[in-house]
Every structure is written in C-alpha cells, then in structure tokens.
Amino acid sequence: MDEEMKEKEFINLENRIWKTYQSRIITATRLLNNSKLLDFYSTIYTICLTLLSVFTLINGDKLINYFSVFISIIVMGIVFYGNTMNYKDRYINMKDNYLKLGNLYFKCLNERINKNYDIEKIYEEYSNLLNTVENHSKYDYLSYRLNDINEKGKVPLLQKIIYWFRKTMLLILKIIIFVIPIFFVIVSFIRMI
C-alpha cells in the first residue's frame, strides 16, 4: 500500500474514533442525566406520597387514599425501572470507555504527525474498546452530528425533524411525570380544607 493510501485510511480510522468518542460522551451524559432524573422523580414522588398519607390520616377521604395507592404504584415502578436500567454503572463504564477512546484519538494524532501509521494496531485497540461497553444509540450519534459543525449540514431534514420531535416529546413527558404527583397533592389538600 502506498504512503498516500495508507495516510487516507489512517485519517478515516482517526475520524471514526473521533465520532465514536464524541457519541460516547453524549451517551454518558444522557445516562448520568437519566440517573439524576430518576433520583429526582423518586424524591418528588416520595414527598408527595408522604403528604398524601398525612392527608389521609387527617381527613380519611377515599379519593386521597386512591391517590396514595396510585402514587405508591408509580414509586414502585420508578424504583424498579431505575434498578433494572442501572444508569449509574452504565455511565461509569461509558465514561471510562470514552476516556480511553480520547487517548486513542490523541495517539492517532501523534502517529499522524510523526507519519508512523500503525493502522492494524490502532484498529485492534479501537475494536477492543468498542467491545468493552454497550454501543451508543442512534439518537446519541444523531445528537453528535447535529452539534458538530462539520456534520451538521450533512444531516437530512427528516432526521432533524425526528430528532427535535423526540426531544420535544421527552420534555413533555418529563413535565407530565413531574406534575402528576403535585397535582394529586394539591387536589387532596383542597379537598381537605
């Protein structure tokens, strides 16, 4: 293989490593945010459940009892979901992986500066890193592409629309999940007065 072809192949591999590195950073951030969000929801729902229990003791209203049961089921679901998704451990593994990918990327830059293209060795290390942790999602890769100045213009309009639609729907869902227990507490408090 001539030197020019070797350099092009090496740059292509270097770009793949960079894209994977950036996508994994986005994935790790999403996993950490999901973990924090679940903790936040657990706290909000537990506080609201405690308030509903106190209202039930004071008032004994059946509707408040139903609200309490409903909130209890949601709390149980949140805890079960949080335990099965294991966001914190997945975040730690993903962060470790992207840090190693970052080191590999800088190793590539150094090899390119020195014109020492050990493609097989770099590719093997890259493949090993890909196999040590779950893959990033298509959504995370799309997030990378939409935030990268060189990739942004290459994303088709339909993918942009789907991305922003999903992002909007997730925000609406998060707001609804946040508002539900507060609504029940307010209604219960009004019924108590």
Where are these regions (language model features)?
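Conserved non-transmembrane functional hotspots
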Residues: D2-Y41, F80-N83, Y87-I175
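Alpha-helical transmembrane segments and their immediate juxtamembrane boundary regions
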Residues: L32-I92, I161-I193
